[in-house]
Regions:
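Mature extracytoplasmic domains of secretory-pathway proteins
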Residues: 64-96
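Short, flexible, mixed-charge glycine/proline-rich loop motifs
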Residues: 28-35
Length: 154
């Protein structure tokens, strides 16, 4: 009876642990503990939600960054085919998928590593910031195409 109870407890624990892990296919954003988690690119503490970002692989493994520009450089170099990429909305700080975000790129955007990128869930707010900084909005594909190029104004 005791061994049956132990087996049932072990099985329940395995299911509970699996439910808390990053889901396969990267459907959930990576786990970032602001003020404690370390950027996988530069080793700095990730503290500004507006620029925190990361990607999750189909295996559930993830990488986190303190700056969108820094992450795009790594993605360009590594080219993981199964990465689901997440960024924060610059104003609401909610996680959003990079492929659906609208980006603003400017040297006037002071991000932790100087990447100059801000992401938005909606076009209207992105265009307002772009107008403020006399620039245009970008798609994720455009951001990746320019990854590694110097930020204007730096």
């Amino acid at each position: 009876m005791r061994s049956l109870l132990a087996a049932l407890l072990a099985t329940a624990l395995a299911f509970a642990t699996g439910a808390c892990a990053a889901s396969p296919g990267g459907t959930q954003p990576p786990d970032v503990r602001y003020g404690r988690s370390v950027c996988d690119g530069c080793g700095m503490i990730i503290s500004d939600k507006r620029f925190a970002c990361g990607y999750v692989l189909a295996s559930g493994a993830s990488r986190i960054f303190d700056d969108i520009g820094e992450m795009t450089e790594e993605l360009r170099e590594r080219r993981p085919a199964d990465a689901t990429v997440f960024v924060h909305d610059y104003e609401t700080t909610e996680w959003i998928r990079a492929e659906s975000a609208v980006f603003v790129y400017s040297g006037d955007i002071r991000s932790p590593m100087g990447g100059g990128l801000a992401a938005f869930a909606g076009r209207e707010r992105a265009e307002a910031l772009a107008t403020r900084y006399a620039t245009t909005t970008m798609t994720w594909e455009q951001v990746m195409a320019r990854a590694g190029t110097p930020v204007p104004g730096h």
